């Protein structure tokens, strides 16, 4: 089977050798390329000195508030005290 001639090897016969059109779909050429989304910033990693023990992740923040009704006293007494306190403050 004969090999295809390169474009530069044409010997003056412009009628026989035509420039092949670039084959690109009309659908693709009609709309521009979509813009790339901006990269999201990465989360800052925790500093080496601030690591907590593995078992204390959730419990460390709960103790800082000091007004956790489930820990200090039951919720019903806390709500009743709030209701009484609102009537006194005039």
Swiss-Prot record:
Intracellular or extracellular location(s): Nucleus
Compositional bias of kind Basic and acidic residues: 7-23, 37-64
Region (Disordered): 1-90
Residues carrying ADP-ribosylserine: 29
Key words, A-Z: Acetylation, ADP-ribosylation, DNA-binding, Nucleus, Phosphoprotein
Pfam families (alphabetical): HMG14_17
Main location: nucleus
Keyword Acetylation: yes
Cellular component aspect of the GO annotation: chromatin; nucleus
Domain of life: Eukaryota
GO biological process terms, semicolon-separated: chromatin organization
Range of residues in the leader sequence: none
Entries under InterPro entries matching the protein: HMGN_fam (IPR000079)
GO molecular function: chromatin binding; nucleosomal DNA binding
Family note: Belongs to the HMGN family.
PANTHER family to which the protein is assigned, alphabetical: HIGH MOBILITY GROUP NUCLEOSOME-BINDING DOMAIN-CONTAINING PROTEIN 4, NONHISTONE CHROMOSOMAL PROTEIN HMG
Protein name, per record: High mobility group nucleosome-binding domain-containing protein 4
Gene from which this protein is expressed: HMGN4
